Amino acid sequence: TKGFKSKWFKNKIKIKEDFIFDKEKDFLIFPEIFAHFAKKLCIDKNISYAIFALNGYTLKPTNDYKNLEDSYKKAEFILSVSKDITKCVKLAFPYCSSKIVESSFTINSANFNLNRAKSNLITYMPRKLPQHSELVLFFLRKHLPKHWKIKKIHNFNERKVFHYLLKSKIFLSFTHFEGLGMPPIEAALAGNKIIGYTGEGGKEIWKKPLFTEIKNGNILDFVNEIIINIKKKHHLKKINLQRKMLAKKFAIINEKNNLIKMIKKIRLK
């Protein structure tokens, strides 16, 4: 959408109003969902570019495979934020294997004050798989103790999302075909036990005891795991250690270092 600017977080992003670029000065980075536009905007005009793959399951934004293949072949490099995305890129575009550059995103653990008192609250985000979340709640309804509540997080700004994640004890993950979904990671850093789908990309961080994987669509296992965890006493020492490792993995220093590497690659042009 023309002029679109995210309202989910504060930003001062400058928006370019045209598609006029200088091949001597400009370097474009396309998200994978727009990779096929590189042919018209860059290849035909001899402008350097890269592709930022944020999700391995959205690498097919067009049925024009020739255009898409050309866009990946001519890209200077391909940025990837997870092991799963890297595998997907290598499988879809084998000739790009040597061009893949590791990237990352930051989740600031300082946003999560774990000294705040927790409530007997379960949170979830239904946006990706609403039918799944509705079924889980339906089967859970007669087994949830009266002193436990469930909160749907939907269309909230960042501040409100963090507010409820910090209050809850359990977060239900309904991620679906994600490169590496942020909500389960944020929920884990906010002090939640995570139960649910990995979205595939989440497999690299989905380790017990902090995370429990449910196979996509296995509603009954999902419900039973929630019931077990409501009553269960968790190994806090192991969970806290795992949470610290997670915070370290998504620390801002890692993203900065990866950005510096990327900028150096661009400057070599």
List each language-model region with its residue ranges.
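A short alpha->beta transition loop at the rim of the catalytic pocket in nucleotide-sugar-dependent
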Residues: 169, 191
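Aromatic "clamp/platform" in nucleotide-sugar-dependent glycosyltransferases that forms part
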Residues: 176
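N-terminal pre-catalytic "stem/leader" segment of glycosyltransferase-like enzymes
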Residues: 1-27, 162, 182, 195, ...
